[in-house]
From Swiss-Prot:
GO CC annotations on file: cytoplasm
Keywords: Cytoplasm, Folate-binding, Histidine metabolism, Ligase, Transferase
Pathway(s) annotated for this protein in UniProt: Amino-acid degradation; L-histidine degradation into L-glutamate; L-glutamate from N-formimidoyl-L-glutamate (transferase route): step 1/1; One-carbon metabolism; tetrahydrofolate interconversion
Protein name listed in UniProt: Glutamate formimidoyltransferase
Coiled coil ranges: none
Binding site for folate: 164-172
EC number(s) per entry: 2.1.2.5, 6.3.3.2
Reactions this protein catalyses: (6S)-5-formyl-5,6,7,8-tetrahydrofolate + L-glutamate = N-formyl-L-glutamate + (6S)-5,6,7,8-tetrahydrofolate + H(+); 5-formimidoyltetrahydrofolate + L-glutamate = N-formimidoyl-L-glutamate + (6S)-5,6,7,8-tetrahydrofolate; (6S)-5-formyl-5,6,7,8-tetrahydrofolate + ATP = (6R)-5,10-methenyltetrahydrofolate + ADP + phosphate
GO function terms (MF aspect): 5-formyltetrahydrofolate cyclo-ligase activity; folic acid binding; glutamate formimidoyltransferase activity
Similarity-based family: Belongs to the formiminotransferase family.
Lineage: Archaea, Methanobacteriati, Thermoplasmatota, Thermoplasmata, Thermoplasmatales
Source organism (scientific name): Thermoplasma acidophilum (strain ATCC 25905 / DSM 1728 / JCM 9062 / NBRC 15155 / AMRC-C165)
Length: 303
């Protein structure tokens, strides 16, 4: 079996019944295991993580996109997070011995099917991009260019989709790709000042001279009256969680602001948390071999 992970992001984070319908559509496909469902009402966005055999990955992702297109009206959607469509971003991630080339093929096969069968415009990104200017997700969709702007811009040659029509319906557009594992990590600050948040987000993101492998945005969380620094850590081995957190803390201190909590959206590799423990506890020579549960699993597998 060739395993892949898929982490589709859907533009619904407030209605659990709707999210469950999308989840169930994905889970109905053979070999699919749903690992996690995260809902965020401030962003009005959900992230569903599933794994399956690569031969079933396109069917499973397509089922989720189709369900989302049927129940989410982007004209009525409001949320803090940038978005293009009901099924907004759908990345495939290689697991175990699966090659990135496999995920690229899956992304392109899915994009073609979504464009042809559902009539939804599709943009390929990351490793699956067919145009160099679309390899970076933020170059396609960002806080200043979302669903509303795409409705007009899609008529231009620059915004011609890789698959599907050059017309945006109520399901919006989908961005489909293949990438390595990333960690979605957010830090909430004890301020409601978005200008401070924007300065911190700019200071830590790679493209503005911050940390390599970090993408960041600032959001205002209305229900908490806090600013959130939302990050994607695209290589946690080279830029670990603790380093991103410490730079946020350092930059925030300039303005008399402190982090009050942080969160991981979706799943995280065990090694990423081991790295955090080693840093803050100054552990020497610590690895997964020191974790009781790992030893127990190994012993059980030897029986």
């Amino acid at each position: 079996m060739s395993l892949v992970e898929c982490v589709p992001n859907f533009s619904e984070g407030r209605d659990r019944d709707r999210v469950n319908r999308i989840r169930d559509a994905i889970a109905s496909v053979d070999t699919v295991k749903i690992l996690d469902v995260e809902m965020d009402p401030n962003h009005n966005r959900s992230v569903i993580t599933f794994v399956c055999d690569s031969s079933k990955a396109v069917d499973a992702a397509f089922a989720g996109i189709k369900a989302a297109a049927e129940i989410i009206d982007m004209d009525a959607h409001r949320g803090e997070h940038p978005r293009f469509g009901a099924a907004d971003v759908i990345p495939f991630v290689p697991l175990q011995d699966t090659k990135m080339e496999t995920c690229v093929r899956l992304a392109r096969d899915l994009g073609k099917r979504v464009g042809e069968e559902l009539g939804i415009p599709v943009y390929l990104y990351a490793e699956a991009a067919q145009r160099p200017d679309r390899s970076d997700l933020a170059a396609i969709r960002n806080k200043n260019f979302q669903y509303e702007q795409l409705k007009e811009a899609i008529k231009e040659e620059k915004w011609k989709p890789d698959f599907g029509p050059s017309v945006v319906g109520k399901a919006g557009a989908s961005i489909i790709g293949a990438r390595d594992f990333l960690i979605a990590y957010n830090v909430n600050l004890n301020t409601s000042n978005m200008e401070i948040g924007k300065k911190i987000a700019s200071a830590i993101r790679a493209k503005d001279g911050g940390l390599t492998f970090v993408k960041s945005l600032a959001f205002f969380l209305k229900d908490k009256n806090m600013v959130q620094i939302s990050m994607n850590l695209t290589n946690y081995r080279k830029t670990p969680i603790y380093r991103a957190y410490e730079l946020v803390r350092l930059e925030a201190a300039r303005y008399g602001v402190l982090p009050v909590e942080s969160e991981i959206v979706g799943l995280v590799p065990e090694q990423a948390l081991i790295d955090v423990a080693k840093y803050y506890l100054q552990l020497n020579g610590f690895d997964e071999g020191n974790i009781l549960e790992r030893k127990m699993e190994k012993a059980a597998n030897m029986e």
